[in-house]
């Protein structure tokens, strides 16, 4: 990372059964103005910081250039859907913090600088996610990024070539995934159960 990258970081949110954990990941990304790479089952995939097609972006030259400008990485939940995210978690040039609500956490390469139990953050039941995110960021001396940081990630995603849709059957399947995802997003909507690894990867790519 460059010398001026102190306030630049990335939040990765993987699978979790806890809505509070997903909400905290999203709140951290919004508080710090960092890009949010959130898997569909992270319960964090929403808001202005969440990026679509992030796994594709990380595998491109512009994506690698953006990662090289980052200084911090926060990992929440259990990310496991893409090789490009796994490679990101294994980088030696990032200060990596893992937030975990379970006994086992994702740090396969052993690169995490610190592991913090989410339930050990000293939060009161009356706290909202924004308050918890603020206290956590302060405790880790994390600095809010300049607005250009997140915007650079959004532009890079927007500049990705349109995904190939090789046949009508594939196009129909993609459209169906998008419709189901949108129907499951509102508060109070029925729980969406995704039944196979290929299905959730398609959802991760399209939704």
Question: Could you describe each region identified by the protein language model?
Answer:
Residues 6, 32, 92, 184-188:
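A structural signal for short coil/turn segments at secondary-structure junctions
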Residues 63-83, 129-164:
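Extended, charge-rich low-complexity interaction segments
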Residues 13-109, 206-207:
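Glycine-rich, anion-gripping cofactor-binding loops and their flanking helix/strand elements
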Residues 96-147:
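Terminal amphipathic helices with adjacent charged low-complexity linkers/tails
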Residues 17-25, 63, 78-82, 142, ...:
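Generic structural signal for well-ordered, non-membrane alpha-helical segments
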Residues 152-207:
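Active-site diphosphate/adenylate-binding microenvironment
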Residues 8-10, 72, 191:
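Structural motif
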Residues 1-5:
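Conformationally flexible catalytic loops at phosphate/diphosphate-handling active centers
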